[in-house]
Amino acid sequence: DEGIITAPITAVVRKGKERFVCDARLAERASLVQPSRKRQTNSLNIAAHILDMDHIPELSRYDRCRICVPQSCPRDCFMRLDCRYQQYLRDSMKPDIQICNHNYLLADASHRLEDRPLLLRSYQALVVDEAHKLPDAARQMYTETLSPHNMDELCLLLQQAHYKDFA
């Protein structure tokens, strides 16, 4: 009524790629399933229409692992031009509000530092689900730990480099 907001506000929930269906992997997996396995066949058929695996009923953990988007998509993928996941990535940059969890935010920060493609569009406001886990996740991601074995190796290297005071 006041004319402050002139268009609908849009939002998208961002998730890691392991939560989405890879159509190429789905086709391969579906071809291996026996038709007599009705529940499994049904879940895989639903996956052909629903990209987000969290919304596919009765999808087994095994099939979820077999049909999810891989860590890196092959450049020669036969589904590249029609890939639902790639389309989702393009479309998810458009909404006004990005919603993600702490791990996705840290992954985006890592991409920005390494000049890799952004996971989140440039934002002025961001909703972070599970934000209370952010400090621990960042600490775990950006902290190096040395085991006693690592320390022994380091001492040996220092000794070999004639730094006897440190060994």
Per-region residue spans from a language model:
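Signature of the SF2 helicase/ATPase Hel1-core->accessory helical subdomain module
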Residues: 78-97, 102-167
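A substrate-engagement module of RecA-like helicase motors
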Residues: 1-98, 102-103, 156, 163
